[in-house]
């Protein structure tokens, strides 16, 4: 029997952590950094893969359409929600201008497949923004 928790529990645990003091502090820093990045990126469609707790990390993004893709039952932002898994994105090829991956790769069952899917749905001039923990830091 495997000791690895199903992705639903890991993602829900991360979303719960984002509601606590250390998680809120991290989200504040990440949100501030993204606000500086978004104005330089053109976007009609922006998609966030995975939960970032109660914070809308795409809020300052100038995209006409913004959505969050996450697992059913995982609490997320008030932005439009799409349910699915990052390893099988429910989007057409070359249909998304910006893909935001907030700690998505650390919690994915197959991070390489997530990146292949992101590459598939990204427009030719699209952008990928990856947020992640430094494995060599205290966090």
Language-model segments: which ranges?
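A short SAM/SAH-binding and catalytic strip from SAM-dependent methyltransferases
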Residues: 97-112
């Amino acid at each position: 029997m495997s000791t690895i928790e199903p992705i639903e529990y890991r993602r829900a645990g991360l979303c719960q952590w984002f509601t606590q003091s250390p998680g809120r502090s991290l989200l504040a820093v990440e949100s501030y950094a993204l606000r500086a990045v978004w104005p330089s990126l053109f976007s009609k469609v922006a998609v966030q893969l995975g939960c970032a707790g109660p914070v809308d990390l795409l809020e300052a993004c100038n995209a006409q359409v913004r959505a969050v893709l996450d697992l059913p039952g995982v609490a997320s932002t008030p932005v439009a929600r799409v349910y699915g898994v990052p390893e099988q994105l429910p989007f057409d090829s070359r249909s998304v201008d910006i893909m935001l991956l907030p700690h998505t790769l650390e919690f994915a069952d197959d991070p390489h497949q997530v990146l292949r899917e992101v590459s598939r749905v990204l427009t030719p001039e699209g952008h990928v923004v990856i947020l992640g923990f430094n494995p060599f830091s205290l966090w």
